[in-house]
């Protein structure tokens, strides 16, 4: 059966959050599904081992300059989707645009959130209610990223990962300045950790200037010989490294979502993002700023 799932939210975190719902649809119909996602979801880089997903189709929308933007872009997207002859589509949004695109693409069975109800939608509860109402399935919010054992073993060998050490992922990056904890906090944690344990630290961050400053400060500390930076490694190649870690301590960043989905116990340092992004998985353990009872946008 040819099934399309539309998940048009931005970023790795949102892509990870929707994995249990994609899996539920695939299992229901005993068939891998195809997903329509944005390029910045990085789905192609970390879902190539996912047995529930067949084709990853990129939705090219880029601030009105993408090939799928506007009226002409919608026509192009219709042509692109028609080639697959999809029988069903599950649309995880309330957009009339995607509803019409699906109809003009020749898809007979269209399942979608109620139209024009985007405001105040809870990212997880809305998806859970949608799958319950359409497929009568209760979906737990516990994403899982699949990796081949040979990749995990290869990373362990190549990076000299020793089970006698405590291997710790430090997700020091973040998409915004208020999401990033200063380097000194990570250094203080490292000092406390090595007092009692033999530790190795894997530094996960992006390549923008502010993130690189944090990494540089850590690599200039007295703990530099215990650190392995991952910023020059492709995202898909970091996954088996993360899988070999016993614990992750991350800002609210893509790596907190990835590590939790890889089954690593993940402490999430929350600042100004809604708390649900740091506690939706049982593998996530959020820490919020002193004096706060919760966090949301603009907490700091």
Q: Language-model segments: which ranges?
A:
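Catalytic machinery of carbohydrate-active enzymes
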Residues: 1-300
